[in-house]
Amino acid sequence: MQTSISTTTIEDHLHHYSPEESQKLLSRESSINTDLFKHENESVDLLLKEMNSTPSKLLPIDKHSHLQLQPQSSSASIFNSPTKPLNFPRTNSKPSLDPNSSSDTYTSEQDQEKGKEEKKDTAFQTSFDRNFDLDNSIDIQQTIQHQQQQPQQQQQLPQTDNNLIDEFSFQTPMTSTLDLTKQNPTVDKINENHAPTYINTSPNKSIMKKATPKASPKKVAFTATNPEIHHYPDNRVEEEDQSQQKEDSVEPPSIQHQWKDPSQFNYSDEDTNASVPPTPPLHTTKPTFAQLLNKNNEVNSEPEALTDMKLKHENFSNLSLDEKVNLYLSPTNNNNSKNVSDMDSHLQNLQDASKNKTNENIHNLSFALKAPKNDIENPLNSLTNADISLRSSGSSQSSLQSLRDDNRVLESTPGSPKKVNPGLSLNDGIKGFSDEVVESLLPRDLSRDKLETTKENDAPEHNNENFIDAKSTNTNKGQLLVSSDDHLDSFDRSYNHTEQSILNLLNSASQSQISLNALEKQKQIQEQEQTQAAEPEEETSFSDNIKVKQEPKSNLEFVKVTIKKEPVSATEIKAPKREFSSRILRIKNEDEIAEPADIHPKKENEANSHVEDTDALLKKALNDDEESDTTQNSTKMSIRFHIDSDWKLEDSNDGDREDNDDISRFEKSDILNDVSQTSDIIGDKYGNSSSEITTKTLAPPRSDNNDKENSKSFEDPANNESSQQQLEVPHTKEDDSILANSSNIAPPEELTLPVVEANDYSSFNDVTKTFDAYSSFEESLSREHETDSKPINFISIWHKQEKQKKHQIHKVPTKQIIASYQQYKNEQESRVTSDKVKIPNAIQSKKFKEVNVMSRRVVSPDMDDLNVSQFLPELSEDSGFKDLNFANYSNNTNRPRSFTPLSTKNVLSNIDNDPNVVEPPEPKSYAEIRNARRLSANKAAPNQAPPLPPQRQPSSTRSNSNKRVSRFRVPTFEIRRTSSALAPCDMYNDIFDDFGAGSKPTIKAEGMKTLPSMDKDDVKRILNAKKGVTQDEYINAKLVDQKPKKNSIVTDPEDRYEELQQTASIHNATIDSSIYGRPDSISTDMLPYLSDELKKPPTALLSADRLFMEQEVHPLRSNSVLVHPGAGAATNSSMLPEPDFELINSPTRNVSNNSDNVAISGNASTISFNQLDMNFDDQATIGQKIQEQPASKSANTVRGDDDGLASAPETPRTPTKKESISSKPAKLSSASPRKSPIKIGSPVRVIKKNGSIAGIEPIPKATHKPKKSFQGNEISNHKVRDGGISPSSGSEHQQHNPSMVSVPSQYTDATSTVPDENKDVQHKPREKQKQKHHHRHHHHKQKTDIPGVVDDEIPDVGLQERGKLFFRVLGIKNINLPDINTHKGRFTLTLDNGVHCVTTPEYNMDDHNVAIGKEFELTVADSLEFILTLKASYEKPRGTLVEVTEKKVVKSRNRLSRLFGSKDIITTTKFVPTEVKDTWANKFAPDGSFARCYIDLQQFEDQITGKALQFDLNCFNEWETMSNGNQPMKRGKPYKIAQLEVKMLYVPRSDPREILPTSIRSAYESINELNNEQNNYFEGYLHQEGGDCPIFKKRFFKLMGTSLLAHSEISHKTRAKINLSKVVDLIYVDKENIDRSNHRNFSDVLLLDHAFKIKFANGELIDFCAPNKHEMKIWIQNLQEIIYRNRFRRQPWVNLMLQQQQQQQSSQQ
């Protein structure tokens, strides 16, 4: 759509001007003195006028001053004109050139006649016809031949054409200038009459010919010798106006301008090669809405033919709006199968045009871009009015063409010394569009300084190159992708780039208007002049062009400037071979730039419009070859065609740069490695040739290949001897045409590549990192005496890959190219950075919808390929995406920032069709890709494949075409957030390391949320203050074996203890460290009150002293701990091991008195320990159960050594038994070889050390040898069932194995039996337990030391927790705050243990005593310290309002009253607040803290273990401040401000699976339930089998508490005592339906009627049979209650609390 619109717009604009005016625009001499870029406004005006002018008006322009046109006549052609219609064909069909003509860049002496003939041709044909007249290479070749033959006949300059037609066949990019109007014989005639009108800016065969005409080269239009050609008066606007008014070409007076003296510009030959017209607005060629409407209103005889020509290529984008509207709306056209999308795009263009109002934007932008220079010559006018005829090859035309091509082409030439066009720029670009594309859309404005310099020199190249580099990467990408006709749009887009100056467009338009013959003549002249200039320029590869500029300072400089600018674009544009074509284009661009400088804005617009028409015609002819690319590449490609006849003309824009790149890279896959060398050598050769052609060598060759080839082809005209020299000679011509240099600038990209070795991924990546970096690299390359790498346009690369031959790569002098290229890079960097804009989707939504613009690095839709390969330093022939028609932008290392090609028509289709193309989301992020690239720089492409194998392979097609396979691979680097260390999911876990990741809260409180500690440092103060308790005392209390222990719950798992002990803040165990080694240091200095408080022994409150009374024995509640076991019973999971230190006898009974009870209890304890051993052998359960106790606690904890297990439960921390219980178990256990549950013997004993239980060990068998005889108080049950252990005196401990399995049985109904194979494990677990206890005493440091101990089975809580402290704050009392009632204070209480903190709700502090009643559950590690902080908020007292009355005496207002001395009294009443002193102002911390209490569990542990006691805790105010006089506020000493009345209960944990109570209330409720159980009583007759009865025997049984006493049936003597607390299950028939009568009973066991079984923890069974069902139900109910409680009563803490109750009761008695 853009193309069609642009062509139609150009045509419409061309129609606005009369032929004379357009001729004036074309014939205007480009004043050397004027700087084309000083006034971009005028150039824009010229462009607008040109766009508004009719083609007929532009055509006659060629008639004027043929001499001037001849050098510039080639630039007058659409190819040469800086402004080309967007529809201008990228690929110019190969123009048929007269074999005698040296090249398209040279114009014969008859260029004037050719210009006239071309005028005639244009008169006969519209611009659209010219654009689309020649759709195939044959037509183009014919037109080219006509154009070339005519100028050759007229000029009669010997030119060697090596198979012109063949060279310009569509196999090569159509960069040769074409007289598209010559399609008809009338066209040929016109071309004869107007040779200069249409010169194929793309390098003709003559240009590409290695042999140049032997005749001396004509003068270069832009050489300094022809200053009159480029007259740029200071008042450029006025002169432009005058030039616009002039119908005949008039030479404006020469005015000193930057073009006049190329030396004053530090441009390398590339810069000189790219004539730099002021950067046109991005959419200069795009018609405005008004133009589109006018165009629709205009009646054109051409549209149909032009439409047909365009449709021949099925390129609807080339159609104008009218054509498309007619095509879609007309009945005939409606029948045609056309893409509605084209119409939509056309409508979209209309809409965009209406919105954007391109004309106004162009004018405004042009004025904004306008340099201080007043007048800007229309380069078209300068061309038409050029007094100096271009020499044989018409290099100036080629330069104009190159300029035009550069305008069209994305500035791909890295070496072109273009300056940044600081126009409109999107810093971030437009999403979905490459920066280059956006630049093309946005008019870019060179800084006026840069405009003046870069307009002439850098703007064409720099704009073109940057445009080409940045844009041609996109355009060239698109063009490379489209590579031929389909990429016309991208080529047009390339013209739309902001980087292309309007003057570039104008120059390209003027060049395109110049006939091919004129171009050839001019190229020949330029070749000659360049050869002359090249001789001095040979010194430096690009300095050749510079020298050429210097020699023809006026023209050459101008030409060089233009050449430099356009060569950038042209070089970047040309896909086949940028070097030559770009150089030719550069020459043409210079000519064009010279003209644009001369052209007034109007004439420039006319010339541009005419040029656009010619461009449209050229595009028509060159559609297949890349219309727009061909235009700029037409000159470049003509050069390249001279160089490589075999090359297919491809997008001249892309080819200009990319051809150079492609030629350099694709012709040589090794060029990537050799790019720097090749480009440098090429630049050198080119510089040499340009030095030979010094006169015309304005633009140093930019593309190493193209420039080399071009230089060689030009050297052939100058010197037929060496093809390289021939190429260089035309290349020097192309130096005049900066496009060649721009292509040379493109070689600097290749230089970048050469700099980066193919395998040197890192350096290559650095080169390719950013386009700016690329520019900087280009700048570095562009330094004058540095070799310039071959410019690599992705399009040119792609074209080279597909169409160019590697052997065609020619080395070009790189020094000058580098110098110009460096400037270009500098300018380009600034420009590229500014130019990085993206075309909005509205502009080319359809075409780019599929294009993957992942980043600026994305050169082609196969982004991953580029990214993965990271712009392979080596360009392979197939590195370009052939199937996708993508230039291998990844190969363009110079362009780290890939840009999607502007024309993605083919790209989209190919992307859709190509499965290898990966969608943009698929490619990794560019950061990842870059990293992957960097990582994989030296790795093979197969490795790249993992990231994007499909795309890699399309890109690897380059490896297929390329003999070189990219050695870069992007590793499949994929961050998996679930597993990768880089994943942020666990990023913040370290924040919670202090209280353990995922650990349970160490503080719990109902209705309160547990948060991380906020006062950890304050909690440390307790530890510090405890040092006041003498170091030895503290160590003895807290450590075993003098080894540091964890000091608080704030400890991490023991596994990490060794790591954390030195770093743990709260629980720092390094007590003997230097800090803690001074016990008095902290207590005496820092917190003496705290030290004293911690040293003070706590005193439990008596009931009389309790202010907040609560019931000690709480009523039974459903939340009793007993309920929890009941719930757990159904779960069949052993939360707690049955083996526990427990009192088997009921707490109400005296265990010592009852031998049965003693025996049973002993057996129970034994079983419990066996269970512990079996179930927790690796866990040291006993050690866990029996936590290390301070030495002070040891006395209370253990009472007996023999039955340590029994005694352990009596310790404050673990349930212990009395000595009386432990004395008999040995006897009882030895009595029963079977170890029935009724017989209990303790198989282990507790090992004490330093007052703490260090572990347990099996009791010698002699002491615990079971007794086989019944002693009366024991029942020897020989009948063990369900896995019972056979009686064996020698395996007593082994007989306890069932208890090991009984842990689950305690909680489940499943029988818990232990096979005999477990017997061997018994002793070993005990040893492990022993070790583990000892290990725990050493803070588990020995855990690693003892491999046998495996703690993995023990929950971490077992390692960290040794009990629970229930801390209930009953209330605060004795609050020492004044005026509590008036302040209406509210306070909260925060408990902080250094790990977590919990804050209570607010309480009203309206009295000195406030009830709180909140209970906290704190996890106790080896030690526990915590603080309670009270924080208050209150209302500051408000002062009362006091009424104040004020009286004032005022003179009376009445005069009479005043006379009498009367006065008025005014009374004023005010309410003044009285200040109230806030008595709380200095008593609170900023956060409201006013009281703090420090608690150390060690102080209270002995007293509160197993029983709850109340205490008064002093709270201190540490925040009160006071001031003495004027001194600042100072914090006073802490003082007691309140007291907390608290109740504390410490419940030690004996087993990690032990279920502890949840509160003080639940603990006592559970104990009360057990106590009430002792009151249960039932009796009756039962038959017993099992235990001591081998057969069923009737007995009388009494159920008392948990004891079932068996009595003789008759005498009722006690025969046995069965400890029901050991029963784990009750088995009877039909438990579920016991209360139902109508049911059938099914059971797995044999049971008698009314029978039931009780199962013990060791698996032993005893059968009972009731006399009747009723009694059976009563027995079952009672037994079930007991069994239900058994799961709870086995808890060691229950036994402990029961024991404490007993002691308390006994003490009270």
Curated annotation (Swiss-Prot):
Q: SMART domains, from UniProt? A: PH
Q: Which family is it part of?
A: Belongs to the BUD4 family.
Where are stretches of biased composition, namely Polar residues?
78-108, 255-267, 687-697, 1186-1197, 1286-1315
User: From the UniProt record, which GO molecular function terms apply?
Assistant: cell adhesion molecule binding; GTP binding
Protein name according to UniProt: Bud site selection protein BUD4
- List, alphabetically, the Pfam families matched: PH (PF00169)
Cellular component terms per the entry's GO annotation: cell surface; cellular bud neck; cellular bud neck contractile ring; septin ring
Report domain PH positions. 1575-1684
Region of interest: Disordered: 1-27, 67-125, 192-281, 387-429, 448-472, 525-549, 595-746, 937-968, 1186-1349
Q: What does this protein do?
A: Required for establishment of the axial budding pattern in yeast cells. May be involved in the selection of future sites of septation in hyphal cells. Contributes to morphogenesis and is important for induction of hyphal growth. Also plays a role in epithelial adherence, and is involved in intestinal colonization and systemic infection. The role in adhesion is probably minor compared with its role in morphogenesis.
Q: Where is the composition biased (Basic residues)?
A: 1325-1342
Might you name a Gene Ontology BP term for this protein? Answer: axial cellular bud site selection
UniProt xrefs under InterPro entries: Bud4, PH-like_dom_sf, PH_domain
